[in-house]
């Protein structure tokens, strides 16, 4: 995955209505893994930048035995799972290894988490009653699904912002194209030019990275 594949979404919160009483599109928790004994959590919600335009962000987390990371001094550290959110742990982790949520003074201002698992629970408990505008940042990737690729926007940080903050759905990525990529067929009639390019995406350990159409 390109290191520049990031997003910044600013707008109103959208929480989808559940399909039925037993299934929520917003938040779910279950036990999975090969023995179905690992606690897992997932959250998904939308950010609307206009009445006709929105995008959904998501995060998945699970319990681990420990967290492996690099501290502020560049040393490799292994943190026991039960110590992941202690003050000592959060002090040694660099910003890019933490998940930050600040929903404002009514919610205790800034909260830091060492794992998605805990951030997800906090968001699920507090976003249900949140009123206002949000800024959500994170990374963007493409996942293969039934022969096609689905855009995924993975949450890193969530902030409450002022109501007059300009809404936007912004992507930042490395975009690759060739001399044949520009389509000017609609330039005169629609005043539009299309660029058919590619983004670099890490697939897996065996495949490595590939260029996918965007």
What are these regions (language model features)?
Residues 1-214:
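OB-fold and OB-like single-stranded nucleic-acid-recognition modules
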